[in-house]
Amino acid sequence: MLVLQLAVLVTAVYAFVHAALQRPDAYTAAEKLTKPVWLVILGAAVSLTSILGFVFGVLGIVIAACAAGVYLVDVRPKLLDIQGKSR
């Protein structure tokens, strides 16, 4: 359980940092939610797995994994395509 929580935490932190480093206009150009909304979603995912992980348990880990997964699989590739960066 702890290994799963740590893996989701690392993934959520990576997604949060990646989202923070992107240009705000790239989100709207990719027709995705705005940058502040994604930062709130991914920040909540990080807090669900780190600070609140013991309160919410497996449910918090699953929610955080879904949020980070959606960003990394759907939003990140579109942002990189819009900005002309390679994956």
Curated annotation (Swiss-Prot):
Transmembrane residue ranges: 51-71
Keyword flag Ribosomal protein: no
Keywords from the named record: Membrane, Signal, Transmembrane, Transmembrane helix
Cellular component, GO, one term: membrane
InterPro entries: DUF2516 (IPR019662)
Compartment(s) of residence: Membrane
Keyword Repeat tagged: no
Signal sequence bounds: 1-19
Topology in membrane: Single-pass membrane protein
Disulfide bonds: none
Family assignment from sequence similarity: To M.tuberculosis Rv0476.
Protein name per the record: Uncharacterized protein ML2453
Organism: Mycobacterium leprae (strain TN)
